[in-house]
Amino acid sequence: MDKSTWTTKVGLAQMLKGGVIMDVVTPEQARIAEEAGAVAVMALERVPADIRAQGGVARMSDPELILAIKEAVTIPVMAKARIGHFVEAQILEALGIDYIDESEVLTPADEEHHINKHKFRVPFVCGCRNLGEALRRVAEGAAMLRTKGEAGTGNVVEAVRHARAVYSEIRRLQSMDEDELFTYAKNIQAPYELVRQVAETGRLPVVNFAAGGIATPADAALLMQLGVDGVFVGSGIFKSGDPARRARAIVAATTHYNEPEIIAEVSRGLGEAMVGIEISKIPHDQLMAERGW
């Protein structure tokens, strides 16, 4: 079968723009997410907060669970593969998954190589902390990006840091001449053509969502106002007191991110948010955002 072109895959990811993608671990949660207005769900055996708490090696989810979630909803279904584990990605493609997330939330399988995403028909989403990581992933074939944040913490600070880093670097590029762009591309180890394209257009060549620590409607609106194209919510919904209501509220806040009155209204009476973790209290070797290169 002919491989889809990268442009086609980028177009598929564009269709999710402005939406919320939710982590789910059961078909019932997937249905709650769909009813709340999620544009896609991420099928997982454990949400990031549980992966962080339980430790051990985190791998691709059981295909049976992924297929059960796929059958439960009509919206697109994503699933995670380990960084560099192209066989997990091949399995997910064979299962008919709509998007594959090469994710630092799982334990990396290869400490030198990311997956060559051009070899797959399915669009990939990858995490990034800065413009260099973003453009290196695009060069490998990623059709969609997201901030890494610090998953499973309920703490939005790292997602904010990564979003601001990407957009401030894009603004810097726009003031550079050709010689400076060449040097900059070399320094961030990204292809010059991609760097030049970003400098000319003032934006990334693919959609960029926020992920990692988003727990409230206000968190979602904050990242949208910073310039992201949509949000991933992992542990923040189903680790909270009233998941269905919080899911609807986060969708509303993402849609109406520039309307404080609406965000204030949907934020009322949501029950207990997930218990968060202070980033400085996490041992350095347990930081998920550090995975990948």
Curated annotation (Swiss-Prot):
Top-level taxon: Bacteria
Transmembrane regions listed in the UniProt entry: none
Keyword Transferase: no
Pathway in which the depicted protein is active: Cofactor biosynthesis; pyridoxal 5'-phosphate biosynthesis
Keyword field contains ATP-binding: no
Assembly mode: In the presence of PdxT, forms a dodecamer of heterodimers.
Protein name: Pyridoxal 5'-phosphate synthase subunit PdxS
Pfam families, per database record: SOR_SNZ (PF01680)
Binding-site positions, D-glyceraldehyde 3-phosphate: 164
Protein's organism: Roseiflexus sp. (strain RS-1)
GO biological process: amino acid metabolic process; pyridoxal phosphate biosynthetic process; pyridoxine biosynthetic process
Binding-site residues for D-ribose 5-phosphate, renumbered to this chain: 23, 152, 213, 234-235
Signal peptide range: none
Annotated function: Catalyzes the formation of pyridoxal 5'-phosphate from ribose 5-phosphate (RBP), glyceraldehyde 3-phosphate (G3P) and ammonia. The ammonia is provided by the PdxT subunit. Can also use ribulose 5-phosphate and dihydroxyacetone phosphate as substrates, resulting from enzyme-catalyzed isomerization of RBP and G3P, respectively.
GO molecular-function term, one example from the UniProt record: pyridoxal 5'-phosphate synthase (glutamine hydrolysing) activity
UniProt EC number: 4.3.3.6
NCBIfam families in UniProt: PRK04180.1 (NF003215), pyridoxal 5'-phosphate synthase lyase subunit PdxS (TIGR00343)
Record family assignment: Belongs to the PdxS/SNZ family.
CDD domains: pdxS
